[in-house]
Amino acid sequence: MQDKLRFGVFGGGSWGTAIVKMLTENGDRVGWYMRSDSAIRHIIKEGHNPNYLSSVEFEVEQLHLSPDINEIVEASDVLIFAIPSAFLEGELQKLTASLKDKIIFSAIKGIVPESGLIVGEHFHEKYRF
């Protein structure tokens, strides 16, 4: 692992947007996974999320935006999940990249519908992290 940790944030809602803003305010370059190609294009062109916290502006050169969850996992040391619990399993099913040696944080509230578990327990039981 290199000296400066590389962060990846997963989720393009208001919570994910706020987390990305905090990380970029600290001077970090941040990988940001969002499902919406149109939101990604808008952020690149206009410097803000069109759907959530639209008054929050980003220095686009600090962002590595992608609709490919695996691309952001592979480019990051620290993974911060901010995907709503109702959609979490659907997004995690797209994962093929290794999570080995990754630092993983959940910023997700609620219960995962597929398992009935809180997110931390779901991660541990299904993915062993």
Language-model features: locations:
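NAD(P)+-binding Rossmann beta1-loop-alpha1 motif at the extreme N-terminus of oxidoreductases
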Residues: 1-52, 56, 63-67, 73
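Rossmann-like NAD(P)(H) cofactor-binding subdomain of soluble oxidoreductases
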Residues: 78-129
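Charged/polar, solvent-exposed surface patches and flexible loops
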Residues: 41-45, 71-74, 90, 121, ...
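Conserved short-loop catalytic and cofactor-binding motifs
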Residues: 31, 60, 107, 111
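A conserved beta-strand/loop capping segment in the N-terminal third of enzymes
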Residues: 53-94
